[in-house]
Amino acid sequence: DVVKVVVAVGVVSCFDLEASIWAGFAAAFGHCYPVFAGFRGGKAVATMFGFLLSTSIFTFQSAWYLIVPFAVFLVVLYAGKMVSLSSMCAALTSSIYITVMQLHISVEIVAASWLLTILVIYRHRANIVKIKNGTENKISWL
């Protein structure tokens, strides 16, 4: 899941950096709604990680675009023990960080980032209900 986004962003970034962001979003969207699996796919968390990894390398050339959301993921996971909540917080953090750092450069990059965050949160809507009801699964190994 991570690799498909890294490859998409990496290849397209050779030609157009802004288009590489959309290639990453398209790969994540395709992961969530695969044609050959009846449009039933994942929750875009692994592909979001691939998006952040690949854009950190190819588009932004700064590891901070990956480190900041990953640090938030780890802190929220340690505090709340819920992977779903941690994933959504990391997605929000990534878009906020990209907005702060890139808005003056490219609205397209910011828009693609927010669309990916919305996709991640939308795919976790059942988990949001469980969190509200106090029935979301928690990890026990941390």
Per-region residue spans from a language model:
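Multi-pass membrane catalytic core of lipid/isoprenoid biosynthesis enzymes
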Residues: 1-13, 23, 68
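Alpha-helical transmembrane segments and immediately membrane-proximal extracytoplasmic
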Residues: 2-3, 14-19, 56-60, 100-110, ...
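Interhelical loop and helix-boundary elements at the membrane-water interface
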Residues: 2-6, 31-47, 76-90, 123-142
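Membrane-embedded alpha-helical segments of multi-pass transporters/permeases
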Residues: 9, 36, 95, 99, ...
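Interfacial segments of multi-pass membrane proteins
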Residues: 12-16, 26, 30, 45-80, ...
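Loop-to-transmembrane alpha-helix initiation sites
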Residues: 65-69, 83-90, 104-116
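Glycine-rich phosphate/pyrophosphate-binding loop and the adjoining helix
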Residues: 103-112, 120-130
